[in-house]
From Swiss-Prot:
GO terms for molecular function: small molecule binding. Secreted by the epididymal epithelial cells. Pfam families: Lipocalin. Could transport small hydrophobic molecules into the epididymal fluid during the sperm maturation. Binds to the head region of spermatozoa and plays a key role in sperm maturation. This is Epididymal secretory protein 4. It is found in: Secreted, Extracellular space. Residues 1-21 form the signal peptide. It comes from Zootoca vivipara (Common lizard). Disulfide bonds join C82-C167.
Amino acid sequence: MIAVLLLVFGMTPDYIFPVSADIPVVPNFDAQKTVGKWHPIGMASKLPEVPEYEQKISPMDHMVELTDGDMKLTANYMDGVCKEATAMLKHTDKPGVFKFTGGEIRMMDIDYEKYLIMYMKKSTFEAMYLSARGSDVGDDIKEKFKKLVLEQNFPEAHIKYFNAEQCTPTAA
């Protein structure tokens, strides 16, 4: 019964939906170097249909801040009007691995000045994301992303690249 309640509320323990130890993590990951603005370039999901919330939030610029090793991600997204969403990623004892309610993020590959490739697993959704400091990356980085996506057994047809207009919420 507890497992059912945890599933309903999105707080799934690792033993129910474990993240594979085979997912690579950047050695010597330095969270401080990720602070600042990141532009989403692309994503891949294991599902043919991306959940509605992910469709809205994934293509939007993300701002990264750090507090005591935890990452605060802030993104603006369109939902009729421009809104802001914030997520807290709690650091773990393994650099480059972060937990959030109902899931985990692993930093798979990074050039702190250019791009970031990360893996996210929730109880009902698995995805990989490519973000960049600028509004685009070269074909070599897109190929690296594609290679990592395929190595994690994501379907190639589920890779998509963004071309989204950004928004800024108006002050209340």
